[in-house]
Amino acid sequence: KEFKDSELQLYIDPETGSINFSDGVLFDYDQYIIKDTGRDYLRKFIPQYIKVLLNDKNKNYISEIIIEGHTDTIGSYMYNLDLSQKRAFEVAKFILNDDFQEISNTEKESLRAILTANGRSYSHAIIDEDGSVNEGKSRRVEFKFRLKDEEMIYKMKEILDDEYDK
């Protein structure tokens, strides 16, 4: 529910709960500095995301929140690995910066304990039905979470589904 009625351009994977920002929302092509519009999207998205994952009901189940950068297949693997890592790092830096007032310092402290930022280059490119790489959809930043206990995966999926369906 938190994101279903939102004007944010994102995709929620129904199987994993990972949230992907559409191509071009956060970054210009081949850049890692967050665009002004991307900053606005993060200011809207992060408080909602944190409210769901780190509320009293859920926070004890979350072992890690992952910001994962992905690129298209244009250019070398190493170039894209560097770019995807820089993008993920820039998002983490923006969220945890003192200037980011949309979440409390207490929430930032909780995040610092479990937040990671990783780059994947083009190792998880998005493939269309015809077998070709969708370069635009491959350029993305994903927000993922890991649970402390494998059996809790199903519990959290139910919780997120309930939140999404409200």
Annotate the PLM regions.
Residues K1-E64, K148-K166:
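Periplasmic peptidoglycan-binding/tethering modules of Gram-negative envelope proteins
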Residues Y32-R39, I66-K155, I159:
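Periplasmic OmpA-like peptidoglycan-binding domain that tethers envelope proteins to the cell wall
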